[in-house]
């Protein structure tokens, strides 16, 4: 007979097996390594950024291993009858059917008109599973199945194009404390310590004959290093330097974790040979041209110069700006002599100073440190203050020069030290024989006290305005005993422009039995 009309659509089938995992996305090459920035303070955590746009579709990689079959989903709700599909291609001829029973031969009737389409019948009971049929033609795509489990990681794909530079990461956690360093050499002899408190005056002893001045004793052993002071407060952030030249590309980073399965993409011709991007083939090292060697050497030299600026060593070739900078860069170092360059110019005018890391001071020694013993001045005229640097012995001024640095260069460095400091201090020791330095025990006043001249021509006196008054730590020059004594004078100020001392003017001198000499202590800035 003639083929019947196409029947209504059947019920929706059960969910298909899970699809194969999508190809792995390409790993972007690491960004170009930037120059190290200046060390700033730890910032507050930023707000979470907005979700970025999805990246471009990666090149299709080889299919991953087939995942295990997912669990059978529950039957879906019956869908509405779909529209009649297009006529399918004729199927292949089936096997001949079995012979039926012979029917009664009827008379040939006339072809009848096509009847109306009947209503959809009720779904029949599910039949038993039939034998596996032959492979039919490819049907229309079915509905998307449920997402299967993540498949095993596929092989590493070829290197993708260079990615955009990522945001700066947050500073890492503080590393563990390093191992203690080896014991260093014995340090140089330290500066003279502060004198002790003035003791109670003893009973006057019998005046003995003045003995000859003994020879200088041997230098004692170096004292033990003091305890490290507390770390200083973090200084203000420095000015941002000019942008340096672009550094060389860093080495490839480690492979990232497998990405989520990508969407199935259509075929696309990229216009290049796939063998060029195979990651499992070793790359031959690039050949460097002569100019590449010159560029590489220049970049290494610039990197070394940047490292010396960030971490000064306190040497003549790599001086620090102040002792405080050296202390911040190397908190484990102990006090001693180091090279600094306060004006940050050419290192040829760097100066050698004593860095006291326990107090954070930068100390510069006077040259010379002492004025030798002598009957400096003889006069029978009226008593008055006489300046050592102007009148006595043709002028003997206090200098603060360092070997290899001119007086003009030293003056420039001292000017920068005053600008960088908030506090300054210095002491001077007046050795006397029958000369009053501070208080006259006979009269009980300070009329015979010495006067000191500061670096900005200010005169520092024993009494008066407290801003210009020095302090006496030890006063052993209060009366005439025909023996040597000493008076230690100290001046501290929050105006560094007033130091160092440039001159001293004693008053009680000029007699035949009067002698004195001076030890100028280091000036310390903080």
UniProtKB/Swiss-Prot annotation:
Biased composition of type Low complexity is found at 9-36, 44-81, 110-131
Residue ranges annotated as compositionally biased, kind Basic and acidic residues, are 165-176
Q: Which residues form the propeptide?
A: 263-526
Q: List the disulfide bonds.
A: 323-355, 363-524, 432-477
Q: Which InterPro entries match?
A: Collagen, Fib_collagen_C
The record's similarity note reads: Belongs to the fibrillar collagen family.
What PANTHER family does the database record attribute to this sequence?
Answer: COLLAGEN (PTHR24637), COLLAGEN TYPE IX ALPHA 1 CHAIN (PTHR24637:SF377)
The protein depicted here goes by the name: Collagen alpha-2(I) chain
Give the organism the record lists: Oryctolagus cuniculus
Provide the taxonomic classification: Eukaryota, Metazoa, Chordata, Craniata, Vertebrata
């Amino acid at each position: 007979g003639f083929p019947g009309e196409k029947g209504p659509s059947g019920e929706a089938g059960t969910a298909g097996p899970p699809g194969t995992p999508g190809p792995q996305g390409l790993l972007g090459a690491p960004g170009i390594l930037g120059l190290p920035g200046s060390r700033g303070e730890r910032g507050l955590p930023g707000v979470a950024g907005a979700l970025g746009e999805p990246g471009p579709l990666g090149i299709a990689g080889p299919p991953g291993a087939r995942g295990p079959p997912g669990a059978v989903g529950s039957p879906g709700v019956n869908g509405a009858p779909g529209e009649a599909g297009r006529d399918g291609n004729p199927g292949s001829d089936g096997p001949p059917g079995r012979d039926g029973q012979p029917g009664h031969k009827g008379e040939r009737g006339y072809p009848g008109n096509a009847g109306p389409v009947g209503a959809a019948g009720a779904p029949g009971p599910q039949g038993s599973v039939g034998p596996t049929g032959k492979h039919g033609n490819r049907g229309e795509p079915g509905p998307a199945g449920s997402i299967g489990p993540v498949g095993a990681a596929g092989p590493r794909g070829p290197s993708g194009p260079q990615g955009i530079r990522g945001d700066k990461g947050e500073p890492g956690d503080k590393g563990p404390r390093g191992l203690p360093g080896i014991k260093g050499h014995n340090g140089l002899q330290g500066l003279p310590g502060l004198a002790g408190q003035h003791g109670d005056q003893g009973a006057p002893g019998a005046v003995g004959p003045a003995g000859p001045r003994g020879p200088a004793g041997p230098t004692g052993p170096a004292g033990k290093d003091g305890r490290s002071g507390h770390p200083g407060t973090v200084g203000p952030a420095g000015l941002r330097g000019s942008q340096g030249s672009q550094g060389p590309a860093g080495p490839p980073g480690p492979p990232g974790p497998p990405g989520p399965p990508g969407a199935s993409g259509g075929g696309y011709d990229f216009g290049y040979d796939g063998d060029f991007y195979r990651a499992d083939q070793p790359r031959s090292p690039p050949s460097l041209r002569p100019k590449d060697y010159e560029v590489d050497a220049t970049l290494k030299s610039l990197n070394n110069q940047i490292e010396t600026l960030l971490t000064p060593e306190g040497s003549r070739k790599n001086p620090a700006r102040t002792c405080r900078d050296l202390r911040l860069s190397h908190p484990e170092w102990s006090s001693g002599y180091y090279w600094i360059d306060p004006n940050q110019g050419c290192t040829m005018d760097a100066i050698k100073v004593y860095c006291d890391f326990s107090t954070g001071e930068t100390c510069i020694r006077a040259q010379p440190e002492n004025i030798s013993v002598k009957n400096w001045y003889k006069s029978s005229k009226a008593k008055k203050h006489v300046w050592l640097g102007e009148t006595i012995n043709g002028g003997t001024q206090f200098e603060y020069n360092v070997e290899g640095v001119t007086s003009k260069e030293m003056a420039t460095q001292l000017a920068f030290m005053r600008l960088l400091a908030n506090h300054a201090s210095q002491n001077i020791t007046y050795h006397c024989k029958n000369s009053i330095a501070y208080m006259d025990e006979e009269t009980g006043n300070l009329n015979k006290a010495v006067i000191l001249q500061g670096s900005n021509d200010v005169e520092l006196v024993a009494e008066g305005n407290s801003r210009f008054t020095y302090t006496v730590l030890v006063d052993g020059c209060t009366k005439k005993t025909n023996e040597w004594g000493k008076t230690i004078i100290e001046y501290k100020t929050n105006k560094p422009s007033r130091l160092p001392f440039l001159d001293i003017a004693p008053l009680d001198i000029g007699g035949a039995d009067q002698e004195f000499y001076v030890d100028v202590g280091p000036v310390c800035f903080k």
